[in-house]
Regions:
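Acyl-donor-binding surface of acyltransferase catalytic domains
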Residues: 38-114, 237-239
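Conserved acetyl-CoA-binding loop-helix of GNAT-fold acetyltransferases
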Residues: 57-62, 186-201, 220-221, 225
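Short amphipathic alpha-helix that is part of the acyltransferase structural core
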Residues: 1-18, 105-140
Length: 239
């Protein structure tokens, strides 16, 4: 299936397929597989596959078509966890709530901004600061942070000249992470960072998405306050 055909099919449910759509849009010649209304897309930055499944048997149907080795994959519906566990022995499943943002609907809202915070584009001088406050082992690597800063719309927050927060876009196009110094929380700095990042990101992609751990209530509140819409529970699977 070619890029145009895949986007036409996936756009029938843009929210549910937001991650696959944004991935296909940014790739010149994406690897796409389809079977009976289900889809698999290869994401080359992270060497993962992204699945949109129509039924419980679709994962087993698509798997033999895949051309690359992979150690993790995404499925846009947590209900298919039993099928993933059956097909991949020892699979480790991590559920998330997925949010999405339609670029055509985003309006830069100055009411969300804190006028006391200065927002700047990130450069590599921020890398040490980011590593000092961002401790997720999978992504807390200097080379990874530098690649995000060099290639994607990432921003930092300054309060009276001091670094107090940042927001990144992952190399696979996923929005986030965002971090604000604990002593500076409650001042709208995260919402301000979101507004600047969304403004740049929506110029690059027709739709964006992010994933929040189910029990991360602070991030859920921030997403709701920022106008990002919930799509549903999804899963990342390590095999």
């Amino acid at each position: 299936m070619n890029k145009t055909q895949a986007l036409e099919a996936l756009n029938h449910d843009r929210a549910r397929n937001s991650f696959l759509i944004s991935t296909i849009e940014k790739l010149q010649d994406p690897e796409i597989h389809a079977a009976d209304g289900s889809f698999a897309v290869y994401e080359p930055h992270d060497s993962t596959y992204l699945f949109s499944l129509a039924d419980g048997g679709a994962l087993a149907q698509l798997e033999p078509m895949l051309r690359h080795e992979y150690r993790s994959f995404y499925v846009n519906d947590l209900r298919f966890a039993p099928q993933a566990e059956q097909l991949y022995s020892g699979a480790q499943i991590q559920p998330y709530l997925q949010y999405y943002i339609e670029s055509s609907e985003f309006v830069f809202d100055e009411n969300e901004l804190n006028g006391g915070v200065q927002i700047v584009k990130l450069d590599r001088s921020w890398t040490d600061y980011i590593l000092s406050v961002y401790s997720q082992s999978e992504f807390s690597r200097r080379d990874y942070i530098n690649e995000c800063i060099d290639t994607l719309p990432c921003f930092g927050a300054l309060w009276e000249g001091e670094r107090v927060g940042f927001i990144l876009v992952h190399t696979n196009g996923e929005l986030g992470p965002i971090a604000v110094d604990e002593r500076m929380r409650g001042r709208g700095i995260a919402r301000t960072l979101n507004q600047y990042m969304f403004r740049e990101y929506t110029r690059l992609a027709s739709i964006g998405c992010l994933f929040v751990l189910i029990d991360n209530e602070k991030s859920h509140r921030l997403c709701s306050a920022s106008g990002i819409k919930p799509m549903g529970e999804i899963m990342w699977v390590n095999i």
